[in-house]
Design a protein with these regions (language model features):
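Structural recognition of the beta-strand scaffold that forms the well-ordered cores
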Residues: 77, 125-127, 176-179, 220, ...
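Substrate-binding/access-modulating region of protease and related hydrolase catalytic domains
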Residues: 213, 225, 235-316, 326-331, ...
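Active-site core segment of subtilase-fold serine proteases
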Residues: 139-233, 244, 248-252, 258-263, ...
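Sec-dependent N-terminal signal peptides
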Residues: 4-16
Length: 345
């Protein structure tokens, strides 16, 4: 495990338990709040243009094919500071971070275009805009998490010690965790008052309400074991069926970094092997400039190798698999050398 990933893993564990004292920075560059605010504004403008394009063409691919074909939606992400030739495409958006999101009629056209762009001078990478899905164990829809109990993490006693040490919750710093998922049920009694403003990248608005349930479940799991100083930043990237696209997810990951999240949770995945350069880029930049830690699911494909899933296979992410009540690997969880840690699931 490289030094940066080791630091990220240690920091993620610390953030899970709401550390009292500030964590020492391992950032590589200085970025001001004004820099982040301007970049965030440009990001949302780009997200709006992307939304208009994806909404128009989203019905032209079959979501059922998404878990086997990275090019299922006929769309690619190209990184280049140069102008590109969009011949053969039906739509495109650009103008942020040198990203060009290009739409084609079929998955095969998109695949061939990506291969061709890889040969173009000045292109850093060309890869599919992968369709992603929520990672969930069927039938699990509760907020009280057994993994925080006395036989496991023992969060209650830890939090009692934390409160005693700090002299009250009012002395703890606010810790923001971005949940990049299906949204947030702001009316749920367990979640009321435990969030900061987020964004809906699916509908392109500032109201990330959950119309699926998975995101609220993940948020509830995080809040279960933490004191009230921990708040959720809900970033909706998956629709009512639990599907989304890499382009919006990458933008949400950067948005979390730019807007003060200490950590981000992504319980979602898609097929990608090594087509993950955009994820690698945004994770590295977020860690270097804003000290954010990205915790990602290994995936729930019943023992598959997590290295074939995005963003689980991004080296600088903390990749989390699941174990059961007997502290054995959960049968639904993905496995492999890319996994950094397991958690109750």
């Amino acid at each position: 495990m490289n030094l940066r990933k080791t630091a990220a893993l240690l920091l993620s564990l610390i953030m899970c338990f709401s550390l009292i004292l500030p964590v020492g920075s391992f950032a590589e560059g200085t970025v001001t709040a004004a820099d982040n605010a301007k970049r965030s504004e440009n990001l949302l403008a780009f997200a709006g243009r992307l939304h208009n394009m994806t909404e128009k063409y989203s019905a032209e691919y079959t979501k059922k094919a998404a878990d086997t074909d990275p090019y299922a939606n006929g769309r690619i992400i190209v990184k280049s500071a140069e102008e590109l030739d969009y011949t053969g495409s039906v739509a495109h958006v650009n103008g942020y971070n040198d990203w060009h999101i290009i739409q084609y009629r079929t998955s095969e056209e998109a695949r061939k275009a990506a291969e061709a762009f890889e040969l173009v001078k000045g292109v850093q990478y060309a890869e599919p805009d992968i369709v992603m899905q929520a990672d969930q164990e069927p039938g699990v829809n509760e907020f009280l998490s057994w993994g925080y109990g006395a036989d496991y993490v023992d969060a209650f006693n830890y939090n009692e010690w934390m409160l005693d040490y700090a002299g009250g919750v009012e002395n703890l710093p606010e810790v923001v965790v971005a949940v990049i998922d299906t949204g947030y049920d702001s009316d749920h009694p367990y979640l009321v008052g435990r969030s900061v403003p987020g964004y809906d990248f699916v509908n392109n608005d500032s109201n990330p309400e959950d119309d699926h349930g998975h995101g609220s479940h993940c948020a509830g799991t995080i809040l279960d074991g933490n004191l009230p100083n921990v708040k959720i930043m809900p970033l909706k990237v998956l629709d009512a069926e639990g599907y989304g696209n890499s382009a919006e997810i990458i933008l949400a990951m950067e948005y979390a970094s730019l807007n003060g999240a200490a950590a981000a949770n992504l319980s979602l995945s898609g097929p990608c092997d090594n087509d993950h350069n955009a994820y690698v880029e945004v994770v590295a930049e977020g860690m270097a400039h804003n000290d954010i830690v990205y915790c990602v699911a290994a995936g729930n494909n019943y023992g598959s190798d997590a290295s074939t899933r995005c963003p689980a296979n991004v080296p600088d992410c903390v990749t989390v698999a699941a174990h059961d009540r007997n502290k054995r690997m959960a049968d639904f969880s993905n496995v492999g050398e890319i996994v950094d840690i397991t958690a109750p699931g």
